[in-house]
């Protein structure tokens, strides 16, 4: 019996020891993040189990044997057994991409620095302490260099703090704050390394941060935009095919759709980096068509207001059949002027705060990370949106007033005057809201909130709404009963061309006859 219990105890002891060893190997150092550790296998081990690493005494309880590495996504990868120490609990650490004597070239570790490179190396870093003060620290003498941690990603980009958009703050605890988008990164998401900077004929080597190229999934935006482009083509085709839709308002609407199609096409090419060979040209073309689209929206807004306010005949008196030519001169001409101003500013203005910087950062568009975008792009957009909103309110107010007037007149004359139901009226307001481009006003909020991650996620809904413009317009203006009826008549050869003077709004059945009043 005693022998039985002895064997039992031995088995239990063996299991316990095995579990402890496994814990020692796999659980690693208690209360210590893997990214706060350093490989100290080559350090001197003292009799009490502690290690002497680069002049720093690492106690035994802050060391452990590892046979894995933890990747940035927190998954484990098996490696050879080695000893690691939680040295960042004892002394501030700095996360390097490569060994401390290597230099980065094209975002790749390029090997040891030469003697000449070491002579021009600036070894100091600005480190922000917990109390908010900023001190200069020698990366090797005053900090622990962590260079054996897994790289955050394959594709990285460096920051140059000479640029206002590349400012950053490195904290004593190892976290990294990127100023332009106000994002805080941990040591899994960035690393530092020596990098050559060229300024005129002189070059210098400084320690520069490298961040991952984190690109959000483009699939959702791509699917929405391609669908939107197809819907735009279908909408334009319907308006070209159906003669009754080709009145003055319909022609303006088609011009708007052409501008929108070209702007979205260039945006899609930029999204998939298919316009890099003509990036600057693509950027200015995209700017031209976006501005032209907004200008055509202002034309449509003004034309709708004239139609419903009863002042269209006054416009006819002065412009007659040349109104469409006048509209074209205004929309395309102003778009050319705005594009020309932006082009000259891009070539002449030296101050980055006033330069649109077309093509900055490989994006074939105006640099939206600075306030110059407000001057050249969002400023004109705000003005035109404000104009469209004013026209929308005046037009909606006029429609409501006309409806009430006709109802009173019909009651007085005891005539049955059936107008659209409330549902139809609300639907018309929705269509009017879309065609006047008021949904674009959300784009301003998206621009202002780009540096706030929370609000950026909120306004992502607005971005998808704008990317879906072609789909929304197709549903509201083509897939409606009156347009489908006109389309069927045209297919059967029953359609007749409508004179522009009739001022029929082809986007909606709702209208009133001024002669009734």
Swiss-Prot record:
Residues 1-27 form the signal peptide. Residues 28-221, 273-279, 345-373, 449-457 are extracellular. CDD domains: 7tmB3_Methuselah-like (cd15039), Mth_Ecto (cd00251). This is G-protein coupled receptor Mth. Gene3D superfamilies: 2.30.160.11, Methuselah ectodomain, domain 2 (2.170.180.11), Rhodopsin 7-helix transmembrane proteins (1.20.1070.10). Belongs to the G-protein coupled receptor 2 family. Mth subfamily. SUPFAM superfamilies: Family A G protein-coupled receptor-like, Methuselah ectodomain. Involved in biological aging and stress response. Essential for adult survival. It comes from Drosophila yakuba. It is a multi-pass membrane protein. Homodimer.
């Amino acid at each position: 019996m005693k022998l039985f219990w002895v064997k039992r105890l031995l088995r239990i002891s063996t299991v316990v020891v095995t579990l402890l060893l496994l814990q020692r190997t796999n659980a690693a150092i208690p209360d210590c993040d893997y990214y706060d550790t350093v490989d100290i296998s080559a350090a001197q081990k003292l009799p009490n189990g502690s290690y002497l690493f680069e002049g720093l005494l690492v106690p035994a309880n802050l060391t452990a044997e590892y046979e894995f590495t933890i990747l940035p996504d927190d998954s484990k990868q098996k490696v050879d057994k080695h000893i690691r120490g939680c040295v960042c609990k004892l002394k501030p650490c700095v996360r390097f991409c490569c060994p401390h004597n290597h230099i980065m070239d094209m975002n790749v570790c390029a090997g040891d620095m030469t003697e000449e490179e070491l002579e021009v190396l600036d070894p100091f870093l600005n480190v922000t302490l917990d109390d908010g003060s900023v001190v200069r620290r020698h990366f090797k003498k005053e900090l622990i260099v962590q260079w054996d941690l897994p790289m955050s990603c394959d594709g990285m980009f460096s920051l140059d703090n000479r640029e206002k958009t590349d400012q950053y703050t490195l904290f004593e605890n190892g976290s990294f704050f990127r100023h332009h988008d106000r994002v805080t990164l941990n040591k899994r998401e960035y690393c530092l390394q020596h990098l050559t900077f060229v300024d005129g004929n002189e070059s210098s080597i400084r320690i520069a941060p490298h961040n991952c190229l984190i690109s959000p999934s483009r699939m959702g935006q791509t699917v929405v935009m391609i669908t939107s482009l197809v819907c735009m083509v279908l909408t334009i085709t319907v308006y070209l095919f159906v003669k009754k839709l080709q009145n003055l308002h319909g022609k303006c609407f088609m011009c708007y759709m052409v501008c929108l199609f070209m702007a979205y096409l260039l945006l899609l090419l930029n999204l998939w980096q298919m316009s890099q060979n003509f990036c600057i040209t693509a950027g200015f073309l995209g700017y031209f068509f976006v501005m032209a689209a907004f200008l055509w929206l202002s034309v449509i807004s003004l034309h709708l207001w004239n139609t419903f306010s009863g002042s269209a005949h006054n416009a006819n008196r002065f412009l007659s059949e040349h109104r469409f030519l006048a509209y074209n001169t205004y929309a395309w001409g102003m778009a050319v002027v705005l594009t020309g101003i932006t082009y000259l500013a891009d070539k002449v203005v030296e101050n980055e705060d006033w330069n649109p910087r077309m093509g900055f950062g490989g994006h074939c568009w105006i640099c939206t990370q600075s306030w110059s975008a407000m001057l050249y792009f969002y400023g004109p957009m705000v003005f035109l949106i404000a104009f469209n909103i004013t026209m929308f309110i005046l037009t909606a107010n006029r429609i409501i007033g006309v409806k009430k007037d006709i109802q009173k007149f019909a009651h007085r004359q005891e005539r049955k005057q059936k107008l659209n139901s409330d549902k139809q009226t609300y639907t018309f307001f929705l269509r009017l809201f879309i065609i006047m481009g008021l949904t674009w006003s959300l784009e301003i909020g998206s621009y202002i909130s780009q540096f706030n991650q929370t609000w950026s996620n909120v306004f992502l809904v607005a971005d998808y709404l704008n990317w879906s413009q072609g789909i929304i317009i197709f549903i509201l203006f083509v897939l409606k009963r009156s347009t489908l009826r006109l389309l069927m008549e045209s297919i059967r050869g029953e359609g007749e061309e409508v004179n522009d003077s009739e001022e029929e709004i082809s986007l909606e059945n709702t209208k009133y006859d001024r002669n009734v009043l």
